[in-house]
């Protein structure tokens, strides 16, 4: 037990940088990773945060509202698609216009498409 007390005393004298270097050296010597245990423990918390507030949204065109030409023009402006691609997207509704965008951008796209006469769903 005297050896353990002596070891604790010596380790207590280490700076943070020296302790980090010690941890890396022990990981290499023993072939283990201290980060793996931390990542497993943190995973449920991260999943709970994702469920609380979604940060990426998909904008889905659900219909052209009878104003296909105006909606095609707006889809082209938003997505930088060519005329035939934008027309195929509008005619193939429901289809995603943009995926993985911020809430503000999704709401902006929704507003523009609805002003053109189309119907949009943000998921």
Curated annotation (Swiss-Prot):
Assigned keywords, A-Z: Ribonucleoprotein, Ribosomal protein
GO cellular component, one term: cytoplasm
Keyword Ribosomal protein part of the UniProt annotation: yes
Entry GO MF terms: mRNA binding; structural constituent of ribosome
SUPFAM superfamilies listed in its UniProt record: ClpS-like, Ribosomal protein L7/12, oligomerisation (N-terminal) domain
GO BP term (any one): translation
Ribonucleoprotein in keyword set: yes
Quaternary data: Homodimer. Part of the ribosomal stalk of the 50S ribosomal subunit. Forms a multimeric L10(L12)X complex, where L10 forms an elongated spine to which 2 to 4 L12 dimers bind in a sequential fashion. Binds GTP-bound translation factors.
Role played: Forms part of the ribosomal stalk which helps the ribosome interact with GTP-bound translation factors. Is thus essential for accurate translation.
UniProt record similarity statement: Belongs to the bacterial ribosomal protein bL12 family.
HAMAP family associated with the record: Ribosomal_bL12 (MF_00368)
Protein name, UniProt field: Large ribosomal subunit protein bL12
Organism whose genome encodes this protein: Novosphingobium aromaticivorans (strain ATCC 700278 / DSM 12444 / CCUG 56034 / CIP 105152 / NBRC 16084 / F199)
